[in-house]
From Swiss-Prot:
CC annotations in GO: cytosol
Compartments reported by the entry: Cytoplasm
Superkingdom assignment: Bacteria
Function: Specifically methylates the N7 position of guanine in position 527 of 16S rRNA.
Protein name: Ribosomal RNA small subunit methyltransferase G
Family: Belongs to the methyltransferase superfamily. RNA methyltransferase RsmG family.
Entry-linked InterPro entries: rRNA_ssu_MeTfrase_G, SAM-dependent_MTases_sf
Listed EC numbers: 2.1.1.170
The UniProt record lists the keyword Hydrolase: no
Keywords: Cytoplasm, Methyltransferase, rRNA processing, S-adenosyl-L-methionine, Transferase
Catalysed reaction, written as an equation: guanosine(527) in 16S rRNA + S-adenosyl-L-methionine = N(7)-methylguanosine(527) in 16S rRNA + S-adenosyl-L-homocysteine
Keyword S-adenosyl-L-methionine: yes
Record: residues binding S-adenosyl-L-methionine: 81, 86, 132-133, 147
Amino acid sequence: MVNKLEQELTQKLEILLKQTALSISDQQKNKLVQLVLLLNKWNKAYNLTSVRDPMEMLIKHILDSVVVSPYLQGDLFIDVGTGPGLPGLPLAIINPDKNFVLLDSLGKRISFIRNAVRELELSNVVPVLSRVEEYIPDHKFDGILSRAFAILKDMTDWCHHLPNEKGLFYALKGVYQQEEVMDMSNNFQVIDVIKLHVPELIGERHLVKVKKM
């Protein structure tokens, strides 16, 4: 039986998605709503996010993650400092043909992600409990995703060992600061800065794509 909150989230998600160019199946929409419900439930006990309102989670966590989807190139991605699986889990839900490693150093976050993977039957997600500098992957990645790093230099310094030859860094950021680029090592180059439209989100959002030279 669908409860009132689930119904409201489903309706709200439909409204939000209509303001984007994303094409998402009904099953995927349902999984995104279930993810919000799970996050809301776990958050009460484990304090996984400062966002308390499920409707707000839909905008600040789900939509903010999925709008990046059209820009992803490749099949194998790692979300570094994923927290409660953001942007990795929403992206995995709407990209069943791509594989995602979700990395975080905090046990309660990885426990939540493992639970979400099980509940939502996500066969394309591997949760990993580790600090990024200690993580040695079996395969290098097509894309390194993160919304956890305050500055680009930190992301490229900490994650330099993760991309494959053609792999890219995808930094999800608020306001784009040109100064950040100046601070980066010469081994890295910004190849694109995309202004993202996240429906009903106050403030700027950007996707910064970086490649290793």
